[in-house]
């Protein structure tokens, strides 16, 4: 009996041992399979995770004035089934668009890194402060996305136009005084439709309400009332980016031209608010490669924005002669218009154009930028 009992005990112990071994093998196998599954999922994530990511960014405004603060919005969307941990978005942006949260960079560019944890089928939106330090046209094109050791560049365009800085009250008083001492200021704001100086033939852009029906019937062609200068205002702003023989240092000259664009933006805003027609020409190069700026005469808020956008694209580099752009603007069609020329000098060429403009029925005056900006040699 003792031998039988010992044999059964040994069998039970062996069975227990086998079961422990099988369980251990099962656990180890499960762990190994789990590790292989994780590695498999890791490879899938590495391969497809970024394909399921959508990233875009944009500024809260299409345009704003230098010195103002706007926001840059980032949106990261996970269109996949798996959560994405530690997604990094790296952006390099000019210091002229200052971002207080930037972590690194240099005097020219700043580095900005956003960190995201994105759950499946989730969109995260973040707002970042941007202080507009310098007039210009700026575009962000791509962003660097990093996840699990994979890096990719995603197209994500964002564009902002920084308009000339708004004038300080002292500058407003100074430019208004310069305009008032010229002969251009003695004209009322409101047009009297019942008073006119003469009758002339219709030209493109004339309003229908100034048609003279009696003269039209008598002459057999469309005739309109030609308003006297005292009845309304059409203003053409002309910015001269030539330095001439003034001897002004290049850096200081660029500052003066920046101020001239601020004057132009201010006067354009005043003209639009009062219902006047306003246009702009400048002999500077632009970011688009053009050698001059030309904004046709018009009214309304859209025209104001067009002028501001043109100024944001302007570079303080001479691209054409002042005489040429005035000739192109006049071209025999400029009538009853006040032409205000901003320049650091007056030479024979400018005097000749002023005489030509006045001979063709316009008023013209030159605003001395050295005087209006209080420049001291």
Enumerate the predicted regions with their spans.
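Acidic, glycine-rich A-domain
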Residues: 269-377
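Low-complexity, compositionally biased segments
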Residues: 9, 18, 173-174, 179, ...
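General structural signal for secondary-structure boundaries
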Residues: 24-25, 133, 198, 203-204, ...
């Amino acid at each position: 009996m003792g031998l039988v009992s010992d044999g059964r005990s040994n069998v039970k112990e062996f069975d227990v041992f086998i079961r422990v071994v099988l369980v251990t093998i099962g656990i180890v196998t499960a762990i190994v399979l789990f590790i292989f599954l994780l590695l498999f999922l890791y490879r899938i994530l590495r391969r497809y995770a970024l394909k399921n990511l959508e990233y875009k960014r944009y500024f809260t405004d299409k345009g704003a004035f230098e010195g103002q603060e706007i926001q840059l919005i980032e949106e990261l969307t996970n269109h996949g089934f798996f959560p994405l941990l530690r997604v990094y978005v790296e952006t390099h942006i000019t210091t002229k668009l200052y971002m207080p949260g930037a972590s690194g960079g240099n005097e020219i560019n700043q580095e900005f890194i956003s960190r995201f944890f994105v759950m499946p089928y989730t969109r995260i939106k973040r707002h970042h402060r941007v202080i507009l330090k310098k007039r210009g046209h700026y575009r962000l094109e791509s962003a660097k996305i990093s996840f699990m050791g994979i890096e990719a560049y995603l197209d994500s365009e964002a564009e902002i136009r920084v308009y000339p800085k708004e004038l300080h009250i002292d500058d407003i008083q100074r430019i208004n005084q310069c305009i008032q001492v010229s002969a251009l200021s003695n004209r009322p704001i409101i047009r009297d439709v019942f008073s006119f100086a003469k009758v002339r033939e219709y030209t493109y852009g004339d309003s229908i309400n100034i048609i003279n029906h009696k003269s039209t019937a008598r002459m057999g062609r469309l005739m309109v009332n030609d308003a006297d200068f005292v009845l309304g205002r059409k203003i053409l702003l002309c910015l001269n980016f030539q330095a001439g023989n003034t001897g002004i240092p290049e850096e200081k000259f660029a500052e003066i031209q920046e101020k001239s664009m601020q004057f132009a933006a201010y006067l354009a805003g005043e003209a639009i608010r009062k219902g006047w027609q306003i246009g702009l020409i400048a002999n500077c190069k632009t970011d688009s490669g053009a050698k001059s700026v030309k904004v046709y005469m018009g009214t309304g808020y859209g025209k104001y924005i067009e002028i501001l956008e043109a100024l944001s694209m302007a570079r303080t580099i001479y691209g054409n002669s002042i005489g040429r752009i005035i000739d192109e603007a006049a071209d025999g069609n400029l009538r009853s218009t006040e032409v205000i020329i901003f320049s650091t000098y007056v030479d024979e060429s400018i005097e000749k154009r002023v005489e030509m403009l006045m001979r063709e029925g316009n008023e013209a005056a030159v605003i001395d930028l050295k005087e209006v900006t209080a420049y001291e040699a």
